[in-house]
Amino acid sequence: MPQNKLFIYLTIVIGAIAMGWMVKDLSSASLDEKNKSQNFLESDDSDVENIGELTAIVNPNWVREEPSSSMRIAQFRLPAESKDIEDAELAIFSGIGGSIEDNLNRWFSQFKQPDGSESKSKARVRNFMVGGMTTTIADLTGTFTGGGMPMSESVEKKDYRLLAAIVKGDSSIYYFKLLGPRSTVGLWAEAFGQFIGNLRKVSI
């Protein structure tokens, strides 16, 4: 399925939930992708969790992990379809320095493209509202080359995909970074869209 259609479909899912109505026509997603993800999506066992000042509905098939860095406020492992494929990881940050654009550009720079072009030019970025909060989502594929920190180890992971969402809360900005093999991230793209679309401010 063309990557552009996947991104459009993801934005529809998030936007639909954010506006309080669900997408009924899923024709833009292939039947194969829908069948693979259906068991993951259709569950009454989702957990409601607080993430900073936000409430989130977490898919029950996502595995909560101890954050691997003090910069992360939460971390989840998203299982691959089979054991011979790597899992994906959702890392959630808050209170990190730099603007939204700065951080997105830093994440984009962690990828390189087969044709040698700048990854920033290949990324798809869109803004809209989720639960009254300004939200930016980004989608990029390519060869992942490392964590982006000064002491991080250089890697070469081909055919990787980044799905990112940045949500501006009342007092903090929340960064959601889903990273992994393109097939694994694609498997969870709709669930990620639902997760972001259902984010709300904590009621006081």
Language model: regions and residue ranges:
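N-terminal targeting sequences that direct proteins away from the cytosol to non-cytosolic compartments
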Residues: 1-88, 95-133, 141-163, 167-204
